[in-house]
């Protein structure tokens, strides 16, 4: 029975471990990095198996502390080695060039893993902060939408009230306009009235003038003498007393009350002689034309 070497056993373990890790969803770069790390470990064990005798090939050869520190310093300066530098560094540390190459490969793999973990932590923190800000902004947006809906409802209510007030004011203005359209002055009333007795109203207004008295007499003599006396007294009293003003309201009331009277009363009575005194000849028995010319 052929005994399996340590390199064959490690190759089998590494292949199964990579097969188990592949379904986890690592990226292609990370997967290739892990494969390089496994290859470096295989190379180290092969080297140890070839240079150790009597069962010591199964043990992994470890580097000294000073060798590890020297390799770390060189790695910080440059993580990849050229063939000439690799040979020189191996001679300085007392190692094989293959050992130095394997150590640098493993160190690069660990460094990449740490960088990925660091980047993941930074991205995770940024994601958490953005999620927190998003939640706060969404809450603020909801509160603002509620306030906007309340303000809209309030504005709509105020507009309805203003419309109602405008309607009521328009109705009041129409009522006031209707009342104003009624003729209030005497001239407007006379213009719009039909069948009005203007002569009777004129004679009645003459009676309202100051110091104008109508003397009732049975003959034309008394009418003429009273007219002369009234003219003299009115001229004297007109200088002493101011004329009485007749307002439109009293005139309108007077005209309305006089419209219902009978128009035939205009020619009846003895008062008509004062109005038609200019048309009638004087009937004085003591007056004669011969006396006037003598």
UniProtKB/Swiss-Prot annotation:
Subcellular location: Nucleus
Known tissue expression: Widely expressed with a lower level in siliques.
Organism superkingdom: Eukaryota
UniProt keyword annotations, A-Z: DNA-binding, Homeobox, Nucleus, Transcription, Transcription regulation
Region (Leucine-zipper): 116-151
Chief localization: nucleus
InterPro entries, A to Z: HD, HDZip_class_I_plant, Homeobox_CS, Homeodomain-like_sf, HTH_motif, Leu_zip_homeo
Gene3D superfamilies: Homeodomain-like
Pfam families attached to this UniProt entry: HALZ, Homeodomain
GO cellular component: nucleus
SMART domains noted in UniProt: HOX
UniProt key word Ribonucleoprotein: no
Similarity-based family: Belongs to the HD-ZIP homeobox family. Class I subfamily.
Function: Probable transcription factor that may function as a negative regulator of the flowering time response to photoperiod. May act to repress cell expansion during plant development.
Name of the protein this chain belongs to: Homeobox-leucine zipper protein ATHB-16
Organism this protein belongs to: Arabidopsis thaliana (Mouse-ear cress)
């Amino acid at each position: 029975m052929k005994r399996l070497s340590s390199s064959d056993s490690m190759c089998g373990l590494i292949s199964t471990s990579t097969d188990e890790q592949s379904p986890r969803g690592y990226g292609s770069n990370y997967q290739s990095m892990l494969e390089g790390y496994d290859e470096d470990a295989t190379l180290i064990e092969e080297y140890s198996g070839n240079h150790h005798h009597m069962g010591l090939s199964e043990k992994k050869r470890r580097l000294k502390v000073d060798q590890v520190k020297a390799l770390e310093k060189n790695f910080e300066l440059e993580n990849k080695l050229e063939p000439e530098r690799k040979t020189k560094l191996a001679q300085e540390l007392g190692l094989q060039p293959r050992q130095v190459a394997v150590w640098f490969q493993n160190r690069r793999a660990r460094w990449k893993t740490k960088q990925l973990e660091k980047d993941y932590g930074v991205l995770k923190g940024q994601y958490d902060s953005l999620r927190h800000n998003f939640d706060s902004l969404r809450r603020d947006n909801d509160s603002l939408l509620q306030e906007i809906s309340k303000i809209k409802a309030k504005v709509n209510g105020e507009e309805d009230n203003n419309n109602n007030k405008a309607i009521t004011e328009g109705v009041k203005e129409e009522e006031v306009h209707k009342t104003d359209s009624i003729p209030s002055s005497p001239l407007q009333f006379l213009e719009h009235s039909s069948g009005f007795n203007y002569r009777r109203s004129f004679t009645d207004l003459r009676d309202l003038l100051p110091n104008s008295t109508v003397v009732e007499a049975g003959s034309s003599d008394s009418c003429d003498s009273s007219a002369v006396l009234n003219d003299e007294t009115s001229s004297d009293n007109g200088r002493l007393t101011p004329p009485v003003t007749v307002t439109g309201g009293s005139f309108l009331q007077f005209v309305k009350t006089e419209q219902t009277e009978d128009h035939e009363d205009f020619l009846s009575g003895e008062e008509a002689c004062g109005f038609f005194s200019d048309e009638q000849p004087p009937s004085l028995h003591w007056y004669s034309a011969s006396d006037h010319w003598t």
